[in-house]
Amino acid sequence: MIFIRSLLFNIVSFTWTFLLLVLYIPILLLPRASMLAAIRFWIAGILALQRVLLRLDFEFRGTENLPDGPCIIAAAHQSAWDTIAFYAVVDDPAFILKQELYRIPMFETYARRLNMIAIDRTGGAGEARRMIRDVADRLSAMRKVIIFPGGTRSAPEDIVPLKSGISALYRRSNVPVVPVSLNSGYFWGRRSFRKRPGRIVAQFHEPLLPGLDGSDFDRILSARIHDGNRLLLDEAQDA
């Protein structure tokens, strides 16, 4: 039954996505707010299909830890779900995305229209400086920047070393960093066709305020993300 539900979800969600990609082309000419509203409508559809076809619900906890103003959200990354679901709780997120995604047909057009941040992970120090400038630009526009500091999707039980980019952003940005733990990979794993029913939980932890020593920041951020991942995985497995 899980296979059939997963197959049906893939067919319907891909059809929904392709249809809206075509219908949204004229919206590219309108103000960015129109494109943002259109993307939120697409994501609402995906999340509704997830609930109905996969019987997979979701919950955000600790949203009171999100500052009203700009901040950096440093989230675990276990699933494709992570790249869309934050729109449910963040009004206008600016995702930091790997450059390879921009090779997907039409993806680059929409990502640039939404003013996302693309990074070349092989670009070295120059690319890191550009990322810091781009993040500063989005924060100055009162947006929340979302980064996956582990760099790529991982299994929910993995303890992934955090990349140095998040430390550089913390030092240079002077805004709170909000850690996020997930258990999405247990239900909707990377490169996995089957998607389990249940409830995905994303937990926003207490923000790390500016002023921490670099080593303390790295240690606390890693502990909050990975300890939270473990607890949420245990919760999913015990349900």
Identify the residue ranges that each predicted region occupies.
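Short acidic-hydrophobic, aromatic-tinged amphipathic segments that line or gate anion-handling sites
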Residues: F60, I117-D120, P210
